[in-house]
Amino acid sequence: PYIGDQSYFDTTYKGLQLVQQELGDKVETKLIEMGTDAAGWDTAYRQAADDGYQIIISGNFQYESYMLAVAEEHPEIKFLNFDYSDAKANSLDNVYSITYAANEAGYLAGVVAGVKTESGIVGCIGGVDSPGIRQFLAGYMQGVYDVNPNAKVISGFVGGFGDPATAKEIALNMHKQGADVIYHAAGGSGNGLFEAAAEANFWAIGVDADQYASMSGKPELAKHILTSSEKKCDVAILQSIKLMLDGKAEYGTQKTLGFVDGAVGLAENENYKANMTADQLAKVEEMKKKLAAGEIKVNDQLKDDKAYDTWLDKVGLK
């Protein structure tokens, strides 16, 4: 839908670039930026359909209904919906839907926060209060608890994905309450968390992409990004397009990709390794192995709509 958020959508754009690089002899690709103004989204999808594209790639719950409306009217066009939210609505014969286990991504971030905190208080910030974002945060709280059951969590929502000023204000307030590690699942708003972390000297955890790397142009901010939970949208998009081109995509179905699939994980870059002790790194590795082996079942907000509230009641700072 657009690029420049240094997170989710930039990673998905890398997926389109991978498609062009690896499959350029079979396909021609084009990026269409729809922006953040919903007034133009329907027109953008219809224009793409009218322009004769055989496959349209789109994702994110905010855009989903617009894409599906056009998909229903154009059965001759194939659609890849990455990060779907409504399984029933995606059961169209020309739509292949994938999503990522955001609960597992959040869980891994929570494990890091739980072993890293010195104050025993950590935070998490969501972009909007939606099931998909609550899925990240509920997983985060479970991860914190599993490695540090006495830790407390402060949670809050920005109200949008393009409001770093509000995210910064929320993060600074959390830090004043004692949070020394704060995670975000807030898209472009999360840049405000990084500003707060640099200003008040605490640790931030990014989302969807290696945000330490994506913020490398601002080293004063990047050095406070301990790690990021990653949705490896780029690889998943490339794999999905290959299936579609080979006629192997299961249209009308929805596939969830998790840690065991290599679709979500942690950014274990030099900043992460330099600022975690050997014991902390070992604990994270232990929990990753348990998750991969199926020994840990992460709560799923999309299957249990009380998961976030249950965990906040259990570990929330009173």
Predicted regions and their residues:
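A residue-level marker of the well-folded mature domains of exported/periplasmic proteins
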Residues: 1-318
